[in-house]
C-alpha cells in the first residue's frame, strides 16, 4: 500500500510540475506577443453601460470591434483618418457562433451628448472611444474591445498568410486598378508587379497589396453595400488561413503582424481568447450587415449624403443576431 501511495503522490507531483511549466510557458509566450502590439488603454474612459439593458442572453458573449482606418500611417500615430471599415465580431459560446456584422460607414448617427454625423466621422472627430460610445449609444450593444488596422496593416497581414483566394468580378478588377496604384505608392512597391486586368476575372490568389485594393473599392456592384461584404469575405479568408497553420507558422505570423495592430485587449483577454481558440474555430460563422434590407433610405442635405435607418428595426435585428434571439 505504501508503495502505491508513494507512486500516486509522485505522479500527482509530476503532473503539477507539468501544469506549472505549461502555465509559465503560456505566460511567457503571451507576454512576448503582447509586447509587439500597439496597446491603447481605454478602460479608464467614460463608457456607456449598455450591458444592464440586455437580458441574461448577453452573458458570456464577447463583442470585438474591428476598425479599418484610411489614415495611411502605422496604427498608433496621431493621424486618425476615417473609420473606413467597421465590423463587430461577436463570439457567442452559448450558440457556438461567431457573428460578423458590418456597419455601413455612412449611417447617420447621434454622437452621445453632441452632434449628428456619419458613423465613419465619429472616429475622425473623436477617436476610438467616441466611435465605441457612438455605436453603443445608437445600436444598443456593448463593445468589449477593439482591434484597429489600416491598409499598411492589411498588406502585411495578408502577405504573412501567403495571400487570399477571392472570387473577383471584372467590375471589381476595373475599380481595383487605381486602388492598386495608390497602395503601391503607399508601400513603395511596383505597380507592374501587382497589376491585374479585367480579363482575369474569376478565382484569384490576391497578395496583400491587391487585397488592400479589393477592400478599398466603393463603386463596384452595389457600392458600399458590397464593400462591406468584401470585408467580411477577407476576414473569413484570414480565419481559414490561420486555422490551417502549424504552431511554427502561427508564431511567425504573430511576430510579423502584431506590430501593425492597435488594440485595447489586455494580456488576460488574449490568454482567454487563446484558450478558447481551438473551440472557436469550429463555431458557425455568420455574416451580417447593418442596416438590414428594407430598413434604410438615402438622404442628401447641406451636411452631405447619409444612409438614414430605422433604428428600432436594426437594433432589434442586431441584438437578436448576436445573442441568439434569446433576449427579452
Q: What residues fall within each predicted segment?
A:
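Entry/capping segment at the start of metal-dependent catalytic domains
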Residues: 7-96, 272, 289, 306
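C-terminal solvent-exposed extensions
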Residues: 44-54, 59-61, 74, 80, ...
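Flexible, polar/acidic helix-loop-strand segments at domain edges
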Residues: 59-60, 159-246, 328
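Extracytoplasmic
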Residues: 59-62, 81-86, 95-103, 114, ...
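Second-shell loop/turn segments in exported
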Residues: 73-77, 117-125, 140-145, 201, ...
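Soluble non-cytosolic domains of exported or imported proteins
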Residues: 79-83, 113-114, 122-130, 148-152, ...
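Extracytoplasmic/secreted envelope proteins and their assembly/folding machinery
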Residues: 85, 116, 128-136, 151-155, ...
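Amphipathic, coiled-coil-like alpha-helical scaffolding segments used for oligomerization/assembly
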Residues: 125-189, 266
Amino acid at each position: 500500500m505504501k508503495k502505491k501511495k508513494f507512486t500516486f503522490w509522485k505522479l500527482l507531483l509530476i503532473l503539477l510540475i507539468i501544469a506549472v511549466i505549461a502555465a509559465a510557458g503560456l505566460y511567457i509566450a503571451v507576454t512576448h506577443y503582447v509586447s509587439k502590439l500597439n496597446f491603447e488603454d481605454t478602460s479608464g474612459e467614460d463608457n456607456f453601460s449598455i450591458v444592464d439593458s440586455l437580458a441574461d442572453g448577453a452573458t458570456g458573449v464577447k463583442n470585438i470591434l474591428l476598425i479599418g482606418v484610411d489614415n495611411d500611417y502605422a496604427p498608433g500615430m496621431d493621424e486618425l483618418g476615417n473609420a473606413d471599415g467597421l465590423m463587430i465580431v461577436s463570439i457567442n459560446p452559448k450558440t457556438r457562433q461567431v457573428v460578423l456584422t458590418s456597419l455601413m460607414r455612412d449611417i447617420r448617427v447621434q454622437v452621445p451628448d453632441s452632434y449628428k454625423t456619419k458613423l465613419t466621422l465619429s472616429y475622425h472627430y473623436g477617436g476610438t472611444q467616441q466611435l465605441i460610445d457612438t455605436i453603443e449609444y445608437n445600436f444598443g450593444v456593448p463593445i468589449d474591445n477593439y482591434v484597429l488596422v489600416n491598409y499598411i496593416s492589411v498588406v502585411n497581414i495578408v502577405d504573412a498568410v501567403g495571400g487570399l483566394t477571392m472570387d473577383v468580378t471584372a467590375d471589381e478588377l476595373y475599380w481595383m486598378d487605381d486602388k492598386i496604384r495608390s497602395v503601391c505608392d503607399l508601400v513603395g512597391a511596383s505597380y507592374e508587379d501587382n497589376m491585374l486586368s479585367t480579363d482575369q476575372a474569376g478565382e484569384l490568389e490576391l497578395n496583400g497589396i491587391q487585397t488592400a485594393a479589393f477592400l478599398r473599392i466603393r463603386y463596384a456592384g452595389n457600392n458600399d453595400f458590397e464593400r462591406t461584404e468584401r470585408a467580411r469575405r477577407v476576414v473569413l479568408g484570414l480565419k481559414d488561413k490561420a486555422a490551417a497553420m502549424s504552431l511554427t507558422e502561427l508564431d511567425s505570423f504573430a511576430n510579423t503582424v502584431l506590430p501593425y495592430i492597435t488594440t485595447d485587449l489586455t494580456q488576460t483577454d488574449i490568454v482567454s481568447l487563446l484558450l478558447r481558440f481551438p473551440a472557436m474555430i469550429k463555431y458557425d460563422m455568420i455574416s451580417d450587415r447593418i442596416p438590414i434590407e428594407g430598413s434604410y433610405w438615402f438622404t442628401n442635405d447641406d451636411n452631405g449624403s447619409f444612409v438614414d435607418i430605422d433604428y428600432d428595426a436594426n437594433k432589434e435585428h442586431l441584438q437578436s443576431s448576436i445573442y441568439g434571439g434569446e433576449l427579452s
